């Protein structure tokens, strides 16, 4: 599943191609949120699905008011943004829910996804590498999936909880104030 607004740089087309390359008739791709896009955008995704052989295995839906439930229904959460996202909330939300994440190795995903532990990071723009990572995630045994979920939740709590984010923000303010004080001291001398 790709939970993302209907914007071309979110990687909908890249993901369709990567899922098609898996050549697995048991896999259905859900583009959650893409259904809110302009009819031309949606039609383009449907046309690409037909062209790549995903016809009948692509679902395009509007956004959900209950993202935790939507995330729990997915076997894998994909973040194939073609442009690095500064934070990428989807990876943190999916990690908190213990879902395997597959993303490109750039932007916020570099911090939120621990490659091989809480998900997989593919080479940016490399559809074959993204497809390989998706296959790895889909092939996880129940035992490995449970282990990944535990690691993923622990990583998110440790690194992205409200308390941790406040602590990091205050540390930045403190550093800026110390730098300002040092600069002021140098000017006075």
Task: Label each PLM-derived region with a short phrase.
Residues 136, 143-159, 168-171:
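A short, well-ordered alpha-helix in the C-terminal region of glycosyltransferases
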Residues 115-116, 120-127, 136-142:
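Conserved acidic donor-binding segment of nucleotide-sugar-dependent glycosyltransferases
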Residues 20, 59-74, 96, 114:
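Short acidic alpha-helix that forms the nucleotide-activated donor recognition element
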């Amino acid at each position: 599943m790709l939970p993302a607004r209907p914007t071309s740089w979110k990687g909908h087309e890249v993901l369709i191609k990567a899922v098609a390359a898996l050549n697995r008739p048991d896999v259905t791709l859900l583009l959650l949120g893409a259904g809110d896009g302009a009819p031309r955008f949606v039609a383009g995704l449907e046309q690409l699905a037909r062209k790549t052989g995903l016809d009948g295995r692509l679902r395009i839906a509007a956004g959900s008011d209950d993202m935790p439930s939507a995330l729990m229904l997915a076997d894998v959460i994909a973040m194939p943004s073609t442009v690095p996202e500064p934070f990428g909330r989807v990876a943190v939300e999916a990690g908190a829910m213990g879902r395997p994440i597959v993303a490109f190795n750039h932007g916020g995903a570099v911090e939120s996804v621990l490659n091989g532990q809480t998900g997989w990071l593919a080479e940016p723009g490399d559809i074959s590498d993204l497809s390989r990572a998706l296959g790895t995630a889909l092939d996880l045994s129940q035992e490995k999936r449970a282990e990944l979920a535990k690691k993923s939740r622990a990583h998110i709590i440790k690194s992205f909880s409200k308390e941790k984010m406040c602590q990091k923000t205050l540390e930045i303010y403190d550093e800026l104030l110390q730098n300002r004080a040092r600069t002021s001291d140098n000017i006075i001398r």
